[in-house]
Amino acid sequence: MPHIQESRVWCRSISQLSHLAEQFVTENGTESTDMKLLLQQCVDTLSNYQDECKKIKSVSKPVPSKELYDLYETAYVYFKIVSLIVLNKIPKLEEYARAKSDAVDRTGKQLLEIYNMLVNRLVKDDRIAEIKRFVKENSRRDPEAKNEQIGVESGKSIPATLLRNLLMGPSASGTVLLVDVRPRLDFMRCHIKSSSIICIEPVSFKESYTDIDLGKKSMITSPDAEIALFQDRDKFDYIVVYTQDSEKNKHNVQQQQLLVDLLINRSFEKALDRTKVFILAGGFSEWSNAHPDFCVSSQGDSVYLNGDTSGLSLQLMPQTTPQKQYNNMFQTMLSGPTDVHGIIRNPHNFPTQQKSKLKRVPSFRDYFRSSSSSSNINERPGSVPPQLSNGSTIYPETPKLMTNDEYMKSLPQLSPITARAITSPSRALSAVGVSKSSASNSISSLLANSGSASPMKPPDTPLPFTDSIKTLGQQNLTVAVSNLNFSVGLVNCGNSCYMSCIIQCLLGTQELCTMFLNNSYQNHINLNSRLGSKGLLARYFSQLIHQMYQYGKDIRKKMGNEKTAVIPTQFKIACGSINSSFKDNTQQDCQEFCQFLLDGLHEDLNQCGNNPPLKELSEEAEKMREMMPMRLASAIEWERYLTTDFSVIVDLFQGQYASQLQCKVCQRTSTTYQPFSVLSVPVPSTRTCTLTDCFTEFTKIETLEQEEQWSCPSCKKRQPSTKKITITRLPRNLIIHLKRFDNMLNKNNVFVSYPSVLDLTAFWANDYDKKVTNNNVELPSRGQVPPFNYQLYGIACHDGTLRAGHYTAYVNKGAVLGWCYYDDTNWRQIRSAREYITQNAYVLFYHRIHST
């Protein structure tokens, strides 16, 4: 009997359309590694998607027809293309990684703002869910699909009895993937018995996540078997999500609904067009009561009990699609008959508008122009402070500040920064001998060649702190060091312990604390600093310190709790307005926050922040520098650095190290000098180690792997090479970050023994032989005179994993209070003399001391 073709026209399925989008991404020019070009393509494609949505909305009678199907299909494909490029491709680019790590790169910062805008558009788009629903309802269903036997709409709840039938009923209704949305510890103790079950902790994801984020972030420490199950999620007939459904676990219930919505509407990597997603009614509580024989505890997961995931084999998520060469055009792919997954569809063309190349819109360039003004906090939409669970305690809150205009009027009259008395380069540089005769007359020419077109230079002496606090400002400086022994806790504003521990440690820095308490920091604000926030971050930080001082100075007890704690709402909002990483309630790395805060304060107080960037060294100047002793070359580089970065933060916290590459064939070297505020040192993978061992590991000669070998300018090719890091400048206050997490977020919980008094003299570059020859000049020492002994005054501690851990702090508050322990709202004096020496140490704070 001849086959009778159906008269009805069907939509292509979600999986078919997703395949088209993936094919376009891999075959049509998106193999570029230029982040700006890819962002331009995304903006253009998103504009096309919006045009299709407008056409869909303009249809007065949405009667199923080929033309209507074309609109919905094209809209979905456009959206999918943007999501694949933005969420899959761009995060893998080296340029993206550099932009995220380099806060000084203005272009990178602008690209990240555009990228974040695109992510925000994707996540908050309220039309794609309806488009997917329409496509699913009007695409041909697989007659053998088992999930059609259950007449429950995806996203709804099913009772425990139905789930049991699905898992073990005689009808074998289909395959089920269970998703347990509870803390890993609860999951280990007891969960539903099934070989296809995974645990996604409720704290591991947020509203802006997609299915890609779940795989790459939320499940980064999950067992291999669970990661494999999640990767095959689209092969299951049903996904059933459950949590501990009770009044005490409202947050988990909210996260459960969030996860279901994510799987249904934001599954960009694996389209769940044939998989239904359900919620287990009553949660695990009802299941365990009804089917106690169908519950089981996990064995062999003790690695999660103490947060030590160093033994786990964490996986890199595979790319959605392989990289291919360009061979097709977009309109060819969409308009022609397509054989997708073995299903041949009758040809029908997409709207003619799509037959041309993706159109460009002028808005992309506008994003660059408008992004530079986005750093002003008062120009951003307001945020609602996070709700706190304890309603019985009223915490003192940092007050809201005046508007920006009011603040500018209230500032003391500042003389123009460019009018500051500046010494000429020739006077700023005085003789330090060069040990190699070939470089004996090179310093002047080197400075000339290296030059900054800067109209100003920093003074020869650093900003004074130790001799007289009065030089910091013209205010009434009544806060004496003896009065800095205040202590108060900070309320956790939703996983903000990473912020609290750093604030407590930084307040142990007496010079910094004094400067903000007496308001002398205002005399250093540079309103024209290119990367600053016009003093807004500094103001919020000062307000918080004042509030903590006010509520902490009168405490006569040896401890404090939530009744005396301060809630840092306004400061947290300010930080989130400047850096979106700190905007929501997700856990962050405390050392990254420390770096952000110090960088932000530096830029606000940067006296040279509006100077033009430094010019790169010429090849001749670089060769001259390589011939100099590292002691001299680093001093020259530091003086160059100060022409664009000069602030009290630099004087208090910043140091410098040299990273030197050397060709093992011809012995040529290339040295770069890098300033730092937080010095990250590796932790050896041994049973125990000392802090000195960490510095030894940090400064040892490293033989580079073949793919990392240096392209030697003399040999004109990649050669076997080594890398050596040398500390060339040690700051007044040294912040040391113990690198306990590797690139896969495995944590090294090795106990690092750190001393109360640390001697780093042996690690400081001291290759200058003090031979003075003609035409040599001497650079200001700026405190770089050995020995370098440091006194410990703060420890930020981390317990658990990077995604699900907790931060606390130990701080030496001076002679009156001594060492104190801080855990959010609670604080107390230490209970034993060596309590602050702990295995959980993560960031160490040292202050330089001088022998009397």
Curated annotation (Swiss-Prot):
Its main location: cytoplasm. GO terms for biological process: protein deubiquitination; proteolysis. RFU1 is an inhibitor of deubiquitination activity. InterPro entries: Papain-like_cys_pep_sf (IPR038765), Peptidase_C19_UCH (IPR001394), Rhodanese-like_dom (IPR001763), Rhodanese-like_dom_sf (IPR036873), Ub_carboxyl-term_hydrolase (IPR050185), USP_CS (IPR018200), USP_dom (IPR028889). PROSITE patterns: RHODANESE_3, USP_1, USP_2, USP_3. It is a peripheral membrane protein. Residues 369-393 are annotated as: Disordered. Ubiquitin thioesterase that acts at the late endosome/prevacuolar compartment to recover ubiquitin from ubiquitinated membrane proteins en route to the vacuole. Also removes ubiquitin from soluble proteins targeted to proteasomes. Is essential to maintain a normal level of free ubiquitin. Required for promoting coordination of DNA replication and avoids DNA overreplication. This is Ubiquitin carboxyl-terminal hydrolase 4. It comes from Eremothecium gossypii (strain ATCC 10895 / CBS 109.51 / FGSC 9923 / NRRL Y-1056). The lineage of its organism: Eukaryota, Fungi, Dikarya, Ascomycota, Saccharomycotina.
